[in-house]
């Protein structure tokens, strides 16, 4: 399930040996598991503070704690040690962390959520923004809510029409319209 190369094990054991705290473990989590925005995160942890959903894996010099709910996403993953221009660094390859694109026969809502997460939100994130699906009407109107830097942004109309709506309609021609229900009067976080 979760493989650590021999070089990475030695490097990690050395990192643990350098810590002042001796009751540390390595917690492996996945933010947004199963979505295109999934990120695997390593953190030192105090095992006694972890919930019972974490399973312990023992290695020479350190222990790893993984949330059982993430096992499926960490299947076939590997932690390796790589040399870089700034020294050594741990690299994790987790081919199942992001889940799979919905099948052709999946519900439209599921497919739209995937496209928003995989293709649209990463572009908006460069301005601190995001968009989320609120719902789909019976007439197949897609209802969206923008947030972060997109909420109150002066360019949100063109972002909606030329970016988001164009991408969604190109992928899903059955969509009649794409509507924004965001309260753009709030410009506290707007990208300007």
UniProtKB/Swiss-Prot annotation:
Q: What domain of life?
A: Bacteria
Checking InterPro entries in the record gives: Fe/S_biogenesis_protein_NfuA, FSCA_dom_sf, HesB-like_dom_sf, NIF_FeS_clus_asmbl_NifU_C
Tell me how the cofactor is bound: Binds 1 [4Fe-4S] cluster per subunit. The cluster is presumably bound at the interface of two monomers.
**What residues does [4Fe-4S] cluster bind to?**
150, 153
- What are the recorded Gene Ontology BP terms? iron-sulfur cluster assembly; protein maturation
Q: Note the subunit structure.
A: Homodimer.
Provide the function of this protein. Answer: Involved in iron-sulfur cluster biogenesis. Binds a 4Fe-4S cluster, can transfer this cluster to apoproteins, and thereby intervenes in the maturation of Fe/S proteins. Could also act as a scaffold/chaperone for damaged Fe/S proteins.
Q: What is this protein called?
A: Fe/S biogenesis protein NfuA
Q: Please tell me the species this chain comes from.
A: Vesicomyosocius okutanii subsp. Calyptogena okutanii (strain HA)
């Amino acid at each position: 399930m979760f493989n650590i190369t021999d070089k990475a094990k030695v490097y990690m054991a050395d990192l643990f040996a350098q810590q002042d705290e001796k009751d540390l473990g390595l917690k492996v989590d996945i933010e947004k598991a199963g979505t295109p925005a999934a990120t695997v995160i390593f953190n030192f942890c105090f095992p006694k503070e972890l919930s019972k959903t974490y399973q312990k894996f023992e290695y020479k010099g350190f222990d790893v704690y993984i949330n059982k709910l993430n096992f499926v996403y960490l299947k076939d993953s590997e932690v390796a040690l790589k040399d870089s221009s700034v020294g050594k660094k741990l690299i994790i390859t987790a081919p199942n962390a992001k889940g799979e694109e919905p099948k052709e026969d999946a519900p439209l809502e599921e497919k739209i959520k995937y496209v928003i997460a995989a293709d649209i939100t990463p572009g908006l994130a460069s301005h601190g923004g995001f968009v989320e699906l609120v719902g789909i009407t019976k007439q197949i109107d897609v209802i969206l809510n923008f947030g972060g830097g997109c909420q109150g942004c002066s360019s949100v109309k063109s972002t909606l029409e030329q970016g988001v709506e164009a991408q969604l309609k190109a992928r899903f021609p059955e969509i009649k319209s794409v509507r924004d229900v965001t309260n753009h009067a709030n410009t506290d976080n707007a990208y300007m």
